[in-house]
Amino acid sequence: MVSLEARFDAVQDQLLQVYENDSNTLELCLQYWALIRRENALYYYARQQGKTRLVCTQCLPPEYQNKRLRMQSRCTYVWKACRNQSLPIKDGHLWTLA
């Protein structure tokens, strides 16, 4: 089984690729929020195992902050609705992470 540290490294690498890609597509925004949600889930499971760090220099957020981050990641249902085209999206709209 892959360790939490290896999974966290993989998510961080994917996030860096998203940042460096600098695309203006909705798909990139959806991928970004999915990775943020996965990162927050890894924080949660690491806390459940009693860890305070995932990678040598990466401290885990406190539990109260972790709960706040999980609440923020729930906004992904809007992105999923956009993906399923149940929300109207104007043609030619630029989506950025900025």
Curated annotation (Swiss-Prot):
Keywords: Early protein. Transmembrane segments: none annotated. GO terms for biological process: regulation of DNA replication; regulation of DNA-templated transcription; viral process. The keyword Ligase does not apply. It holds the Pfam family PPV_E2_N. InterPro entries: PPV_E2_N, Regulatory_protein_E2_N, Regulatory_protein_E2_N_1. It comes from the Viruses. This is Probable protein E3.
